[in-house]
Amino acid sequence: MLVKIYPENPNPREIKKITQIIEDGGVVIYPTDTIYGIGCDISQPKAVARLAKIQGLDMDKAYFSFIFNDLSQISEYTKPMSNAAFKLLKRNVPGPFTFIFEANNNIPKLFKTRRKTVGIRVPDNNIIRSIVSELGRPLLSSSVHDVEDEVAEYITDPELIHERYGNVVDAVIDGGYGDNQPSTVIDCITDEFEIIREGKGEIK
């Protein structure tokens, strides 16, 4: 299913439709402020396993991030962060960044693999943030493209994304052409903040 949603003014009815698909255990593809993302409800293990299978990822090694609507729920999933880290977030979100923090015990047991960290995203995109706000909890997210592959045209054009993934996901949101750059990733485990992947956007 390909669903057109305008990022400037997302239709609440369409937002509710996509949110219901996610709540029912669906996997969806959506625009962000960088590359299109693919994600599901973090609280549904079957959906998470399906997402990993679609992406061809080993859950022990897979890298996922959590998409939030704002900063209000982040502390529910990370260990306490320093004032410096919180100020870094406030200066740069919403924006094209992934911030790596230590995960706390509230992360679903499914993610208690070798990874003890969590990637935090608050994209500057009204569509996905409206969906997460309606859902009431963060969305487990991965980029549509394989990080080892070059960014191809199919992952910037939602119609081509639908042609490629439409038979394995429950919905693809057409929010216009996506970007061809991934997010910039910042390690915030300590206050010696380190950029571990250069992507779209400059840290303030």
Q: What feature does the model see in each segment?
A:
Residues M1-K204:
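Active-site-adjacent structural elements in enzyme catalytic cores
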